[in-house]
């Protein structure tokens, strides 16, 4: 088996599309953006903004990449479930609550914790599937 150093652009796109469709948020647009964070789900535009650091993905970055994409997909799922405006209000309320409790508005935010758990819990499943499909 040949070990590829980089994941092709086509394979990366196929993985993202598969994940979005599976979790029934296929209408989410994906765009690369220069940013400090790995990714961000822009609830106002319904766009998953992916850091340009993921323009090319090394095989050693697949775990981090899958966790990141799944994390942001969870936010998209919440926005679909509650409606984007209500989800944005709920998220901001949670941020303000954490600040009032002198906690970190991101790391202690229940929506971030749930999204991170989602990514951590499902990345292996998708890693196995994408390996079988020879996408990674």
Kindly give the residue locations of the regions a language model identified.
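Short acidic, low-complexity intrinsically disordered linear motifs used
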Residues: 1-7
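Zn2+-dependent metallopeptidase catalytic core
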Residues: 8-26
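Catalytic zinc-binding patch centered on the HExxH motif and its immediate surroundings
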Residues: 21-62
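Short, polar/charged, Gly/Pro-enriched helix-capping and turn/loop motifs at alpha-helix termini
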Residues: 26, 83-84, 129-133
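Post-HEXXH active-site segment of zinc metalloproteases
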Residues: 63-67, 79-113
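Short active-site segment of divalent metal-dependent hydrolases/proteases
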Residues: 70-78
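Long, well-structured alpha-helical subdomains associated
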Residues: 100-136
